[in-house]
Amino acid sequence: MKRVLLLLLCALPAAAGPLEEAGLIDVQTVENLPVFVSLRYATQNNFTGKKIYSSAKCYLHKDAVEGLKKAVSLAAQENEPFTFCLWDCYRPQDEHRKLWQAKPDPSYVAMPKRGSRHSRGMAVDLTPCDFNGNPLKMPTDFDSFTKEAHMDFYDLPADVLARRETLKKIMTTAGFTYTRTEWWHFDKKGWKSKPLLNVPIP
């Protein structure tokens, strides 16, 4: 009897964690979503020079995931098809405060008292890449904090400018809005209705 009970317990699905209860999903567990995850803040390869995240998993709210699915589908239909490499996804509030301490400039990092849209699971930082995960040429690297990263900067090589505009078109069609100072940052519409979270990334 004990053995049967143990087998039944093992067959039950794992209990949802606090992120899942808030509607967030581990992007790499989503079927038919061929994206690459390379969280910069899970490494030292970011503007702080320090590892900010203890986990390299990309969590997004299910609404943002649906938008990302649409963006991936649209990118695959381009004359030169591509997919995306995700640089940042859900960001706990504690980790966001660390970024603010390193760059206390609201033009680039949201003020902690207002909270980041990343902390709602409704923002994603990404770049176009080929289907082997190699990033395509874009105006700047991630978190460059320069005028060249601005969406209204046009003194760029023709192919780079065209790719940035294609990215903007795809993401806005998929239900995201863009940020003027960061070509890589997109917010899913409806983010205001989602709570700020400070749950560690598992």
What do these predicted ranges mean?
Residues 86-97:
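Secreted/periplasmic proteins that engage bacterial cell-wall peptidoglycan
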Residues 13-14, 93:
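Residues at or immediately preceding the N-termini of alpha-helices
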